[in-house]
Amino acid sequence: MTKRQPLYKSLYVQVLVAITIGILLGHYYPETGVALKPLGDGFVKLIKMVIAPIIFCTVVSGIAGMQSMKSVGKTGGYALLYFEIVSTIALIIGLVVVNVVQPGAGMHVDVSTLNASSVAAYAAAGAQQTTVGFLLNVIPNTVVGAFANGDILQVLMFSVLFGFALHRLGSYGKPVLDLIDRFAHVMFNIINMIMKLAPIGAFGAMAFTIGQYGVGSLVQLGYLMACFYITCILFVLVVLGGICRAHGFSVIKLIRYIREELLIVLGTSSSESALPRMLAKMERLGAKKSVVGLVIPTGYSFNLDGTSIYLTMAAVFIAQATDTTMDITHQITLLLVLLVASKGAAGVTGSGFIVLAATLSAVGHLPVAGLALILGIDRFMSEARALTNLIGNAVATVVVAKWVKELDTDQLQAELASGGSPLVDTRPTDDLGVAEGPAR
């Protein structure tokens, strides 16, 4: 029988306490809270520092170790099919809820009185977002550039090609594969060290958020926030919960299993901050490395359920608040634009707002200056977006793995029943005594 870890050593408890202290400090000492922003930024940068090499190692090791290349194409095809269906459902749910509840009705905001300069940078960034540009951006100018910029899709593109090439070499490429596996062990050990700083990062980020924007900004547009949070909760419990039940597992148990990652995301407002740990945890949950390596990184651009809900709700809210007519034709057009635009949102803080700006620019019917209405509360809404995105990608990984018969269901049930013990304590060690990454 394993000795139970003391409560104060649990990362879950440490991050939760840090977030609470950050909220209190930001509220009562806002200037001090704002000054702590570098703590949150520094932690997120440390995580981003190792995301690219971890994705590379995971994807290459998974693909190169597969028996057949057909299974890679099958996994990718099923993943994209799942992403498109579920994210479309999320967009429609957001559209339905905002039309039924109408959180912006009665505000009668005059667009000419809004401070458009406050959102000019977002509008300019959004105007540059095009479908062709997005697709071309997946191809890196140089391999080094992809890793230097930390662009997930560019790194994924190169990693898949590298994995295919290494697989074709057969036994001749095995020394390279072994080297990559050992390099992965080093990267995951770095992640273990960085995660010890998670409470500090969450504390600094939350103190800054409350200190900068204040609790008062939550009250002003609280109706929209409440609608959005409730919609995200219902989406997770009803839609994702239904998908989980149909595939033989519980979404509640899955949420409990990834609770530490969810708290890290809550503190940083970026689902990207939990990506390295999610790669390891989903594999430990019973999904094969090849599936995890493809689904998780791709999902960070193509399966952002929380962002999809936010985009439709925010766009129609702006129309309602500014008394802009949105008939059925306009709303269908909005939905079609978002089906494409939502795929360009990465799992980083602020990306959803940029995609919203791009959508308003593309539709043309909605006032881009209306972004100023939700600029103050967007940072608070980003938590719900990031949490929903993370849960959605966890569900997608298990479901796709089951579809392609690359899921150990016994291991899945055992891990979910255990509640997910700390990742660092469950790693086996190799003959050098070094903690390993997930088994291939």
Curated annotation (Swiss-Prot):
Alphabetically ordered keywords of this record: Cell inner membrane, Cell membrane, Membrane, Symport, Transmembrane, Transmembrane helix, Transport
A biological process from GO: L-aspartate transmembrane transport
Bilayer-spanning residue ranges: 15-35, 46-66, 78-98, 146-166, 190-210, 224-244, 291-311, 332-352, 354-374
Domain of life according to the entry: Bacteria
GO molecular function, one term: succinate transmembrane transporter activity
UniProt cross-references to Gene3D superfamilies, sorted A to Z: Sodium:dicarboxylate symporter
Ranges for region Disordered: 419-440
Matching InterPro entries: C4_dicarb_transport (IPR023954), Na-dicarboxylate_symporter (IPR001991), Na-dicarboxylate_symporter_CS (IPR018107), Na:dicarbo_symporter_sf (IPR036458)
Protein name: C4-dicarboxylate transport protein
Source organism: Pseudomonas entomophila (strain L48)
Originating gene: dctA
